[in-house]
Amino acid sequence: MTLVHDLSSALEGKREEIVAWMAQKRSEIDVPIYGSVDIRDAGWKIAVVDANQFPAGFNNTSESDLPHLTERIAAHIERHHPVCHWVHIYPESHTRNQGYVENLRTLCQLVELAGYRCTIGNPELDGFDALNGIHGPLPLHQVEVVDDVLLVQGQQPDFILLNNDLTDGDLEGLSTKSVLPRPQMGWYQRKKSQHFDFLRPLIEEISEIIGIDPWHLICESFVSEEKCLEKEACRIQLASDVDVFLAKLAQRYAALGIDREPVAYVKNNRGTYGLGIMTVTSGQQLLNLSNRKMKKLMYGKGNSNTEDFLIQEGVPTLMQTDAGAPVEPVVYLVDGDASSWWYRINPKKDDMG
């Protein structure tokens, strides 16, 4: 069985070629101002299992990473908006999620450390002077939209940092080019599968350089389209799709000597915040869904109906704490750079999360 960990010497030997390849790719792509990815290390596969264009956990980053995060934020803003002095953060409308409030607080701190004035707010939060976070209140600023122009206390900021995933659709006041990430990246338009479609050719290229089968560096996945689980015919077809997918995984596992039962994640292709996700080891489990679980799978954030499902290989994590709790690395990227790593630990979950 191939263990990715055994490739350390090969990676070191190809260091210069890999660094040059990455530099070339960055020059060809307009990298986002920020994003985050969840990674699973199974030993025989190390792969990104989820990606977020509007990361909401900056409060989890290490204090020692703040200088580098600040440096990368400043570099990105200077490159795209060289005359910027004022950055406005356009947040989600979570008023009770204290963890998210702390994310905003840290994000604002990074912007201010980069040398910019920073304000926070959106029109839906105009009834609030502040949001209550874990470490106290976070002040908000009055926001209104006039003729599709976003104004903060009557003035237009130089740059809008979007920290709202736009599940319910595009919003007024965000049509200006001074908004990053682009609103078109919102969940109302973006799909989870697009991340893997974009990632796959890159993985294939780097795998050829390293000398490894790309299967060891990416999740297997496909999209089962136009499915409404309220209709029995759709559920039967989706279950059949899952069974075919799992059978192919089982064949690959057997060929590689991987002694475990394949697992598939069934995900709302537009889903977020962990909604519209379940794990299965057979299509029959979908046919046996209770009404409650079926509705949970069908709806994403904002109660949006689900028709397309991403069927994704479940990659277990071999990383764990001394007490045996599973550990999942999370990478926060700023300006195309892996700027901060932290680890998600949940003793209530198994190695599949």
Write out the residue ranges for each language-model feature:
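N-terminal glycine-rich "phosphate-gripper" loop used for MgATP/nucleotide binding
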Residues: 148-173, 183
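Structural alpha-beta junctions
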Residues: 105-125, 175-187, 201-213
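A short, well-structured beta->alpha microelement
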Residues: 115-154
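ATP-dependent carboxylate activation and anion-phosphoryl transfer catalytic cores
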Residues: 1-129, 232-236, 248-263, 273-275, ...
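Short glycine-rich anion-binding loops that position phosphate/pyrophosphate groups of nucleotides
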Residues: 54, 164-167, 268-271
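Short acidic, S/G/P-rich loop/turn micro-motifs used as interaction or catalytic elements
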Residues: 94-99, 166-169, 185-188
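Active-site nucleotide/adenylate-binding loops and adjacent lid/helix of ATP-dependent enzymes
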Residues: 69, 140-146, 151-155, 175-177, ...
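Receiver (REC) domain switch-region micro-motif
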Residues: 87, 160-161, 179
